[in-house]
Amino acid sequence: MLIVLFLTLFCSVVFRTAYCDVAIVAPEPNSVYDLSGTSQAVVKVKWMHTDNTPQEKDFVRYTFTLCSGTNAMIEAMATLQTLSASDLTDNEFNAIIENTVGTDGVYFIQVFAQTAIGYTIHYTNRFKLKGMIGTKAANPSMITIAPEAQTRITTGDVGATIDSKSFTVPYNLQTGVVKYAPMQLQPATKVTAKTWKRKYATSEVTYYYTLRNSVDQHTTVTPGWSYIITADSNYATPAPMPADNGGWYNPRKRLSLTARKVNALRHR
C-alpha cells in the first residue's frame, strides 16, 4: 500500500500567471508492499510546498484514488480518501489501502488537488501490492512512466490551459518565467551518425555576489509521452552461477609472470 505522490502542480491563470510546485518526499517510489499478514496497511505520504503561487493556503481539497492499468486505460480501483486542506497537518497524509480492493499487481495513485479556481490531476509512480485477496484485476506490468498530468485553472468564465505550440519554440529562445521542453523521445535501435556537433556551441552564466529577490525562471514544463512503453518481469529461469556451468576460471591461470617481492630483492 503505497501512495507515492509525485505531484508537480503547474497553474496558469488568464491575465495573471501563477505557478505552484509540490514535491513529494515520502514514501519512496517503486516499492513493493506485502499484505499477506494483514488486511490493510498505512502508508505515510509526505510532501512539501515551494514559495511559488498558488501557495499552500490556496489548496482547499485533496482526493486520493487508487488506480491500475496502462497510461491509456486508467482504471479506478478504489477512492482512498477526500480531505480538506485544513485536515492535513505538516503536509502529511496517512493512506489506508485494504487488501480487498483488487488482485496482486501494479498500482498507482491519482491525486486530485483542488483550488478555488480550478484543479490539477497528477499520478504517482507505480508500485506493487502483494497478498491481495480482491477479485478486481490489477495490471501486472510495471510500466515505466506515470500517466500525463492534467491542469485546469479558471478565472471567472475563462479557462486557462497550456498551449501545445509552446513546446515547439526552441528552448533557448523562450523568455518567460515558465519554459517548455520538447517531448522526451526514446533512442533508436541503431546509431547511424558518423560525426557529431554541439547543439549549442555556447551558453550563458551569470554570477551573483548578493542575494537576488527575483528569479528569471520558475519551472520547466515537459509534455507527456504520446506513446506507451510497456515493461514486464523477466520470467526466464535464473542461470546457474558461472562456476556451475564451466564459465568460472582461476585468475592465476591467466598470469604469465611470477610475482616477486621487490623489497626482498633490493636488500640482497
UniProtKB/Swiss-Prot annotation:
Any one of the GO CC terms: extracellular region
Pfam families registered for this protein in UniProt: Kre9_KNH (PF10342), Kre9_KNH1_C (PF05390)
Post-translational modification: O-glycosylated.
A Gene Ontology BP annotation from the UniProt entry: cell wall biogenesis
Keywords noted in UniProt: Cell wall, Cell wall biogenesis/degradation, Glycoprotein, Secreted, Signal
Signal peptide, first to last residue: 1-20
InterPro entries the record matches: Kre9/Knh1, Kre9/Knh1-like_N, Kre9/Knh1_C
Record flagged with keyword Chaperone: no
Highest taxon of the lineage: Eukaryota
Subcellular location as annotated: Secreted, Cell wall
Family of the protein in this entry: Belongs to the KRE9/KNH1 family.
Family matches, as PANTHER family: CELL WALL SYNTHESIS PROTEIN KNH1-RELATED
Job description of the protein: Involved in cell wall beta(1->6) glucan synthesis.
Record protein name field: Cell wall synthesis protein KNH1
